[in-house]
Design a protein with these regions (language model features):
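Acidic, His- and aromatic-enriched active-site or binding-groove loops in soluble protein domains
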Residues: 142-160, 196-223, 254-267
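Alpha/beta catalytic barrel-like cores
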Residues: 1-126, 131-145, 319-321, 333-373
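Glycine-rich anion/phosphate-binding loops
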Residues: 95-111, 151-164, 305
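Secondary-structure boundary elements
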Residues: 115-117, 155-178, 217-230
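Catalytic-face loop-and-helix region of soluble metabolic enzyme cores
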Residues: 253-373
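Active-site-proximal loop/short-helix segments
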Residues: 122-141, 172-203, 239, 252
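Active-site beta-loop-alpha junctions enriched in small/polar residues
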Residues: 10-12, 126-130, 182-186, 236-242, ...
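Structural preference for beta-strand elements that scaffold enzyme active sites
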Residues: 2-8, 12-16, 45-55, 120-122, ...
Length: 373
């Protein structure tokens, strides 16, 4: 029987103050995985599934967030953290090496913390479009300025992810790998809102079909190097209808959206977006909803709005069965709207913590009961 809902997180996890102690030899990577396994390692109820994930960011220092974690996966690529951001180029700097060490220590911790685990295990990375906007070339320009460099990113990422997933399978033989590909800045890239280093102008709009070509290249590479099929890849996108349509047309099988960012169905723009989501659902695409379960995050109202819009589109509430709910603090919402620079380091407070995941787990039974009717 298919689950009524699946619960997971956005790939980040922040340990609480004072959580590290002698019980785990003061190893934050081991402790984080042990805590995550206790939260998401076993489904809380028969019809509520969970998707455990390998944390890509613990926020322990400046090199421990999603961007450097993804850069450490790029095959045959080097660089460093410069004054203006993460630079791709000759030589491996200390910060880049630290990001690689974080990746390796997380994998080593998985061997112990996930001993005997059997089930889904997600890895999270930035997508190639967001990477192009968030990184810099040796010249100081963003990678987005060099279309040749942008075209290289999907294959470099696919090769690196393939190696990473092979190591993960070796350390956790019972794992069924899943990939959450976060394109937090895709709206700003496609709409031409990414600033140049001077800040006086923006880079030209990057057409959605070209973004689709990058994703196709990445998914083809992943099928080749890691036997990861489209059903095991979730693409997190923004609220640009051309991006959503492109993702559907190239065969993306799992789409993650933040319903809090979607315009109302009653508006012309909202009608087009919601109808595009409905078309994706009708074509067999699985929908995943990023929600903020924290107090003040408005999760209940957001999910009520999803079901209300779903019914106005002609669906029954039961048709929302099978959705995945992703715990997410909403930090990337501002990136999607083009406010902060995607190259900037996020604050540690934007990462998930135990309380946030627990809040989503507590809300899951009520959601499951509603969509079961």
């Amino acid at each position: 029987m298919s689950p009524l809902v699946t619960i997971t997180g956005d790939g980040t996890f922040r340990l609480g103050t004072g959580a590290i102690g002698n019980d785990v030899a003061e190893d934050p990577f081991l402790l984080a995985l042990m805590r995550l396994r206790s939260l998401l390692g076993d489904p809380p109820e028969e019809q509520i599934a969970t998707r455990l994930y390998l944390p890509s960011a613990l926020g322990l220092d400046d090199t421990d967030h999603l961007l450097p974690a993804t850069l450490a996966l790029l095959a045959g690529t080097s660089g460093d953290l410069a004054s203006y951001g993460w630079r791709l180029g000759p030589g491996i700097g200390r910060a880049w090496q630290r990001a690689q060490d974080v990746r390796d220590r997380t994998l080593d911790a998985a061997r112990i913390a996930l001993l005997g685990y059997e089930g889904p295990l997600a890895v999270t990375a930035m997508g190639p479009v967001t990477l192009a906007a968030a990184t810099f070339l040796p010249s100081g320009e963003r990678t987005l300025a060099d279309r040749g460099a942008v075209r290289d990113l999907p294959m470099l990422l696919a090769e690196g992810l393939g190696e990473h997933l092979a190591l993960l399978r070796e350390r956790v033989p019972g794992a069924r790998p899943h990939l959450l590909l976060r394109e937090d800045a895709v709206n700003a890239v496609v709409e031409g809102r990414i600033p140049t280093p001077s800040g006086r102008r923006t880079y030209p709009a990057f057409p959605a079909p070209e973004a689709g070509t990058l994703w196709q290249c990445l998914m083809a590479g992943l099928r080749t190097v890691s036997v990861l099929d489209p059903e095991s890849i979730t693409l997190g996108i923004g609220t640009d209808v051309t991006v959503l349509r492109t993702a559907r047309e190239i065969g993306v099988r799992r789409l993650a959206v933040s319903p809090a960012r979607l315009p109302s169905l009653e508006t012309p723009a909202g009608r087009v977006l919601w109808e595009e989501l409905a078309a994706a659902h009708d074509s067999g695409c699985h929908l995943e909803l990023a929600v903020d379960p924290r107090p003040g995050g408005g999760m209940t109202a957001v999910l009520d709005g999803v079901l209300e819009s779903w019914q106005k589109l002609g669906y029954a509430v039961r048709d929302a069965a099978g959705f995945t709910l992703i715990a997410h603090t909403g930090a990337s919402h501002a990136v999607r709207s083009g406010k902060p620079d995607p190259s900037q380091q996020p604050a540690a407070s934007t990462l998930l913590d135990e309380a946030t995941i627990e809040a989503l787990l507590r809300a899951a039974p009520a959601w499951a009961e509603r969509v079961e009717r």
